[in-house]
């Protein structure tokens, strides 16, 4: 790896080797996990290279290939598992300046990978009265390319399912890591080759996404004395086909009172809540539906006189629930779970009863293959890595799937098996394994046994440490 020669080849491009800047841009939100914080704290790249065009990306990748320098792509750096952290050093490819909104048409938008989701949604309504179908809770800073390469769902998934569901990404344009990099257009099922692949098998340079009707969504919070009543309310609302909701998030006490400091005045400490985004035209029906429940509306953004300083409702949900807890109590961490249907509420109750306040519940209602399901992002009052692993094992022993946010590899953070399609595509597009090394176990160690119970340690990371 000849960094000096690479810098000469990149003359005229935006290159930064200031140690503080390089370290800053070599990190994401890995510190959500105490395990990853310890493992990845020392990780840093050698250079930050910031292209403005696809042609510059091609030039950068060709030069890195020539000098054997690894490349790790970065959007806004808001991922949680070290997706954008360069385990083998090398170049961090900062795509933030490829942020143009190139085309807006009925039902679709085309952007560069660095386009920020909130900026896209500011541009699209004036043209077509539409918005993106879904977004993470990091909507304000997150880039679309980063969301496609590292995300899975978010606000809007109650209507539109997961990001990898067919039709939720229309087209991707990517560049390969070869001596002469190729530009590829992926559509249909082919987009799955690079989606949620952390940039291990191609650099995304353009994204085409579907749009849906835009509304001035109303933030609502409903309070409950019992968490399972809150969860049941969320489930019942999710199956109301006539009430348009963009977000249905039950959160157990004492999370709201203890960690949602700006909203704290609306809650009692023992009160669980459901955080919601409701379409304006659905509010009357929603109010009638809520009146049948055991809940009380404790907050309505359209009725609250003083909204100054209050974050939007979505910044209480998804990964922001954990973020707000960590800001108050740095020992907090979290899990990512899926409670199997049709008895998803039964599985939730079993885990709530088993762990109590050690693992306070946080649910997100989403759509799976046309049916309502529950993803969980429960908080964990962290004590030791061994206890964290035990909590994970108990969930799995009780039929709950864990997508482990305390691992930096695709497989361990997913279904604990090789994605043969993504692996085959990497063989085609990155034959030297220079794109985001260490993140795909199937490439680094094809014989790895996922049943071993041991976490995978990338040899390059071990050397760097």
Task: Report residues per predicted region.
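Short amphipathic alpha-helices in soluble, non-transmembrane regions
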Residues: 6, 64, 233-239, 282-296, ...
């Amino acid at each position: 790896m000849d960094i000096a020669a690479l810098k000469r080849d990149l003359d005229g491009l935006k290159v930064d080797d200031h140690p503080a800047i390089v370290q800053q841009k070599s990190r994401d939100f890995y510190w959500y996990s105490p395990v990853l914080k310890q493992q990845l704290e020392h990780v840093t790249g050698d250079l930050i290279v910031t292209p403005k065009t696809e042609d510059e990306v091609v030039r950068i990748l060709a030069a890195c290939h020539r000098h054997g320098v690894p490349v790790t792509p970065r959007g806004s750096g808001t991922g949680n598992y070290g997706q954008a952290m360069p385990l083998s050093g090398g170049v961090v490819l900062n795509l933030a300046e490829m942020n143009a909104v190139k085309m807006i048409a009925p039902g679709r938008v085309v952007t560069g990978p660095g386009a920020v989701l909130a900026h896209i949604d500011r541009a699209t309504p004036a043209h077509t009265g539409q918005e993106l179908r879904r977004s993470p809770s990091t909507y304000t800073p997150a880039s679309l390319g980063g969301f496609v390469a590292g995300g899975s769902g978010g606000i809007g998934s109650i209507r539109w399912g997961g990001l990898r569901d067919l039709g939720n990404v229309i087209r991707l344009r990517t560049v390969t890591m070869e001596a002469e990099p190729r530009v590829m257009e992926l559509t249909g099922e082919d987009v799955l080759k690079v989606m949620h692949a952390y940039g291990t098998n191609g650099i995304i340079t353009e994204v085409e996404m579907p749009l849906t009707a835009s509304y001035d969504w109303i933030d609502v919070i409903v309070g409950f004395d019992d968490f399972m009543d809150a969860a049941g309310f969320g489930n019942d609302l999710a199956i109301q086909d006539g009430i348009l909701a963009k977000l249905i998030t039950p959160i157990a006490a004492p999370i709201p009172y203890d960690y949602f400091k700006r909203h704290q005045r609306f809650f009692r400490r023992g009160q669980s809540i459901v955080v919601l985004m409701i379409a304006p035209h659905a509010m009357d029906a929603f109010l009638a539906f809520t009146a049948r429940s055991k809940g009380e509306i404790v907050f309505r953004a359209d009725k609250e006189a003083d909204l100054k300083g209050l974050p939007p409702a979505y910044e209480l949900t998804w990964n922001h629930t954990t973020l707000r807890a960590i800001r108050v109590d740095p020992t907090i961490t979290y899990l990512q779970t899926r409670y199997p249907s049709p008895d998803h509420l039964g599985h939730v109750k079993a885990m709530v009863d088993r762990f109590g306040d050690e693992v306070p519940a946080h649910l997100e209602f989403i759509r799976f293959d046309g049916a309502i399901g529950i993803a969980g992002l429960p908080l964990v009052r962290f004590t030791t890595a061994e206890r964290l692993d035990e909590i994970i094992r108990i969930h799995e022993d009780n039929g709950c799937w864990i997508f482990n946010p305390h691992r930096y590899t695709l497989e361990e953070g997913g279904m604990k098996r090789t994605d043969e399609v993504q692996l085959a595509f990497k063989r085609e597009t990155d034959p030297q394994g220079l794109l985001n090394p260490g993140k795909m176990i199937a490439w680094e160690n094809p014989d790895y046994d996922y049943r071993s119970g041991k976490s995978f340690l990338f040899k390059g990371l071990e050397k760097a440490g």
